Amino acid sequence: MEKNNNFEMLGYVAWLWANSPLHRNWSLSLLAINVLPAIQYGQYTLLMRDGVPIAFCSWANLSLENEIKYLEDVSSLVYDDWNSGDRKWFIDWIAPFGHNYVLYKHMRKSFPYDLFRSIRVYKGSSEGKITEFHGGKVDKQLANKIFQQYHFELINELKNKSEVISIN
């Protein structure tokens, strides 16, 4: 995407952030951390209706190491982290005007064979929970097995990390 279009895209996303009860009070630095790499890598979807943005979704392809880094601090990802592996994470999901289901259907159709996870945060909460998403053509049982494998790998890596820390 051309640089001028990147600025236009950033404007659309900033407008959605300003209209989102969850995002509107977040800092400009969080907007930059969460949105600029997605735009630069083309790892986003923007839905428009009558020339007006109605929903936005961005994702990162993380390595296990960067997944752990992200889970420990959601604002820790740097540009190179966004394409460091094959573990897909939704970074932003914004539909402030009631188009959440439209975005959901669009993503299932656009990524029919992909698996994603996200950290879901509710307005007024400082904690999030991991949610899972699979494309429209992925067998649900297979998706569950793969997600279980992801969790197993994540837990083992966290255990190994804590053992290394406690030894030192």
UniProtKB/Swiss-Prot annotation:
Q: Matching InterPro entries, A to Z?
A: RTX_toxin-activating_protC_bac
Free-text disruption phenotype from the record: Mutants can express and secrete the LtxA leukotoxin, but LtxA lacks both leukotoxic and erythrolytic activities, and is unable to cause a change in intracellular calcium levels in host cells.
- Enzyme class label: transferase
Lineage top rank: taxon: Bacteria
> Major location, coarse class?
cytoplasm
Q: What induces it?
A: Levels of toxin expression vary greatly among strains. Highly leukotoxic strains (JP2-type strains) produce more LtxA protein and ltx mRNA than minimally leukotoxic strains (652-type strains). Variations are probably due to different types of promoters.
| Keywords for the protein's UniProt record, in alphabetical order | Acyltransferase, Cytoplasm, Transferase
State the similarity comment: Belongs to the RTX toxin acyltransferase family.
Q: What is this protein called?
A: Leukotoxin-activating lysine-acyltransferase LtxC
Encoding gene (name): ltxC
